[in-house]
Amino acid sequence: QVLEGKVLIEHDDIWGNATVLDSVLPELSALDCVGFKVVHARGVTGVQYLTEDVLEKMAAFNAVAPAHNPPYIAAIRQFRSLLPDTPLIGAFETAFHAGMPPEAALYSIPIELSRKYDIRRYGFHGASHEYLSQWAADAMDRTDLRLVTCHLGGSGSLCAVKNGKSIDTTMGLSLQCGVMHNNRCGDIDPYILFYLAEETGMGLPELRELLEKKSGLYGMSGGISNDLRDI
């Protein structure tokens, strides 16, 4: 990780260096607890004490949240080493979507694979969608609303909300799917991957980089920018 002034701008090495945390948060001992907005874990959602068991379940989904889970896990473990007696609590982005009905949450793959590997539509940006739905209910002074909420940023998602509950969302097992993102492709025909592998010889690492970093607005603009304002 790179420290620019007191702003952390990269995440390679920072959590192995306690002195950097000390310089940013010089009075760690004054903290009663530390809260994290965490992203993804296999079979775990909601608000959780970040025990080693929960961290292992987060690590089990590193493959589907590679840009998020590894640095989060490293940060949590660094705080634990500095504050061994302080509760560490995580609020998962997937929490708002955890109650989606089966017809929205399940993928049409063999059900035994879904059950064995905890494959389902988890959804993300939950705090954002929940806030929007609550704001709309307060503004309109009613709770019996059917809404489509939109989270727009470097990545984006839509959520169908009925009476304050998420009933469907565009993101799924990973943050890769759904609407087009700045660099991520969003939903595509899965056979594009097989076709590209056969035609170009690209392997899994190259295909992963293509989908995660070279697609979306960046890819469709021919590499001009991942920012719609520039395009």
Annotate each language-model stretch with its function.
Residues 1-16, 172:
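Short glycine-rich, Thr/Ser-proximal phosphate-binding strand/loop in the N-terminal lobe
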Residues 10-32, 61, 75:
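Conserved active-site "lid/cap" helical segment
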Residues 199-231:
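A mobile "lid/hinge" subdomain adjacent to the ATP/sugar-phosphate binding pocket shared
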